[in-house]
Amino acid sequence: NLGLKNCWGFDMEAACAGFLYALEMGTNMICSGRYKRIIIAGGDHMSSMTNYEDRNTCPIFGDGSACVMLEATTEDVGVMDSFNRVDGKGYEFLHMAAGGSAQMPTHETVDQKLHYCYQEGRNVFKHAVTNMSNAVETIAKRNNLTNDNIAWIVPHQANVRIETAVAQRINVPEEKVMVNVDHMANTSTGTLPLCLWEYESRL
């Protein structure tokens, strides 16, 4: 639909962190000087991995996608800094038991419903609030930013309780935190670009 020709692309899979991973990669590709424009599309088909008999997860997830375009510029705008980490210690709190190379799909794994997303909400909540807050504080300290300098916080849309707790922990007014999970659900990789699209007129 965009009429693009002679372009190349690739897929990345990192679940809820996928858009940030792609943003980091796209930013560095542009900074290398070899690329002028990059389109990042974020989205997941969460309904295909949601167990509708599990009331802990089925109301949380939704399908959605959006994209952004990165462009080289000489202006003092754009992605100025980033802070990324990965921690596999909480794997058992949020995972899909089968479907990968460790446990290949079989008739038995499907019958046992091992291809659905499983999570322990309380542990995910604690982990998310702590690490999301630490990430914001790290970036702010590294760039000499105060809460007055921050126009918006754009968090992953896991649930409203997490976003509210993060805002309280870092002492940022809740009205500065973008929220769309209340009507779009958790669309995984799609949450951040969907927030940017929905709040575009207010940026």
Features from the language model and the residues they span:
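Structural motif
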Residues: 8, 36-39, 66-68, 77-78, ...
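Acidic, glycine-rich active-site loops and adjacent beta-strand->loop/helix elements
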Residues: 14-17, 42-47, 85-87, 183-185
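Flexible, active-site-proximal loop/turn residues at the rims of small-molecule/cofactor binding pockets
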Residues: 44, 74, 159
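Short, well-ordered secondary-structure micro-motifs
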Residues: 50-51, 92-94, 165-166
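Condensing-enzyme catalytic core mediating Claisen C-C bond formation in acyl metabolism
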Residues: 54-126, 130, 134
